[in-house]
């Protein structure tokens, strides 16, 4: 139903956000980030 689709969309957004943050911190560890 509608509720399940909404939950799926939110989960997708959250996953994308978390993955992005993980990638950023990984890049920082590898290349050494400068603020």
Swiss-Prot record:
Transmembrane segments: none annotated. It is found in: Secreted. Disulfide bonds join 28-33. It holds the Pfam family Antimicrobial_2. One of its GO terms (biological process) is defense response to fungus. The keyword Disulfide bond applies. Expressed by the skin glands. GO terms for cellular component: extracellular region. Its main location: secreted. The keyword Transit peptide does not apply. InterPro entries: Antimicrobial_frog_2 (IPR012521). Keywords: Amphibian defense peptide, Antibiotic, Antimicrobial, Disulfide bond, Fungicide, Secreted. Belongs to the frog skin active peptide (FSAP) family. Ranatuerin subfamily. Antibacterial activity against Gram-positive bacterium S.aureus. Shows no detectable hemolytic activity towards human erythrocytes. This is Ranatuerin-2SPb.
């Amino acid at each position: 139903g509608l509720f399940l689709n909404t939950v799926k969309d939110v989960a997708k957004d959250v996953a994308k956000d978390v993955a992005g943050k993980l990638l950023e911190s990984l890049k920082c560890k590898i290349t050494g980030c400068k603020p």
